[in-house]
Amino acid sequence: MEITKDDAIKARDFIWKNSKILGQASADRSYLEAFLKSKLALLMAESTETTMAGKEMYAKSHPDYIALLHGIKEAQNQEVTLKWQMDSAKITIEIYRTESANNRAIDKSM
């Protein structure tokens, strides 16, 4: 399968269009991971349990904490998916560059 100039341009445009989205996805994941610690502390403080283990069990089984974990999972999925799509676009461009250089070398030798 030969990669055309149009394919390389589409790959470049994809990277350009999605770079900000990837940055936001990464920031969202980082924020949620940091907030998870705060949420754990808030829920532990809210607990009526007397032991630390009891407070932690209450907090980690709380629906808000579980919802936050699901949010982190979704944010990480979005980030990783975009990262691999970006890597694929970069590889497409590199293959096009290599094929173009090879074709120029063949043309010179003829």
What are these regions (language model features)?
Residues K5-D6, A27, P63, A101:
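Intrinsic-disorder/low-complexity regions
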Residues A27-M57:
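Extended alpha-helical coiled-coil "stalk/arm" regions
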Residues E2-I3, A105-M110:
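Short acidic DE-rich linear segments
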Residues S26-R29, E33-S38, H70-N103:
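Long amphipathic alpha-helical coiled-coil segments
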Residues M1-K20:
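Short, charge-rich amphipathic alpha-helices with coiled-coil/heptad character
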Residues E49-Q78:
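Short, glycine/alanine-rich amphipathic alpha-helical segment
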